Amino acid sequence: MVEKKITDIVIVGAGPAGLTASIYAARAGLSAVVLEELGAGGQLLSIDNLENYPGFPDGINGFEVAYSLQAQAERFGAVIESDKAVSISVNEGNSGDSRFVVQGIQDSYSARSVIIATGAKPDPLPVDGADALVGKGVSYCATCDGNFFRNRDVIVVGGGDSAVADVVYLSRVAQSVHLVHRREALKASPWYARQLEGIGNLVTHWSCVVSDVLQEEGRVSGVQLNNVLTGETSTIRAQGVFVAIGTRPDTKWLSGIVELDESGYLVADEGGATSVPGLFAAGDVRTTPLRQVVTAVSDGALAAEAAASFLASC
């Protein structure tokens, strides 16, 4: 039996936090393996124009940032594996070599330290039957799927920055965009809110929630709305429903292993250290007052440096 190589750092997640962590780890002379179920980039892949990333006055496409981060990580020697982590075991008595074993769907990975950078996933639309229509008109990624609805009618559900960004993008390809928000005003930042001014094909529906997703022949044909103030119902006919109502951390597989807060985020200090020595957190998956690409990148660098210091002390 061939003994598997033990990696210095296994990084779970290849979003901006995970990829940055791998860059800093590899540059520090540590072996780094990044596990990513989907394409490298995380939520960067859903950003058409990243306008608040320092150094790009006109913004930059999220795909471009993701590609550059991956190329940079691989240039310094990080290895990106197409796999999904499903569990992690901690060898409490082993402070050195194989302290952690991360079990993936494809393989298992022994490591001296681990950085969790799995980010957060979109909250599902809380409507019966909506999940079955994902890929059939319901989408959680406007930049991924928006072009399929060129010159058609679409609906965006949500009122935060992500929802507004979706509206702006979709207004350029769709015939009409209906924005549905359960409040009387946007939650989005003032700068984002101003982006809606002057969009001629936008229709807003305030104080409304989606109570049903309508379908014909197995595809979305519209939604039914319920006004939360008056109780009145109405119907919007559309072929696409883009959901942007929030995110939740991908941490169920870590329950009982490491401390999580009441919302499921990994509790971590400024350097990313968690309640388990040698286990670090970076990006949207951790407790933090701000979840942006720029903070995820910073988290990744800090977690890698903290992991390197931990390994040096073992």
Describe the function of each predicted region.
Residues K121, P126, A132-F148, I245-T295, ...:
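FAD-site-proximal beta/loop scaffold in flavoenzymes
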